[in-house]
């Protein structure tokens, strides 16, 4: 698993990383941190948490950061209610606005809180969310974020087929 997730991370960097880009150092630092965390991970959950943090932070660096605080339509803050996640729009939509949009992917507020924490906290900081996360939560988040990442490139992420095998 460690090798395949490392391969996945490398592939994302080769797709979105641009040589001589002002954010190259930030991307390199993130790459180093995620590989270090994957190498020292004691469980699949630890590997996946490192990769989820990478997915969220990498998309933020390259300008495709996700919105988890407010509805992308009405801009109202979404607190402890369920919401919908729009891959096309890059974030959450409240139930009221979704009546018009028809986004199918319902997102529980605890899942949103988990991803928000993964995106906001320092890479090496272990939050309560890291400790409470289950393999299933990590798997759902990884797949959701991978789908979002895939929607921003016309290149196929090849390593994902091995991870899903």
Enumerate the predicted regions with their spans.
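Non-catalytic alpha-helical scaffolds and adjoining flexible linkers that form interface surfaces
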Residues: 1-165
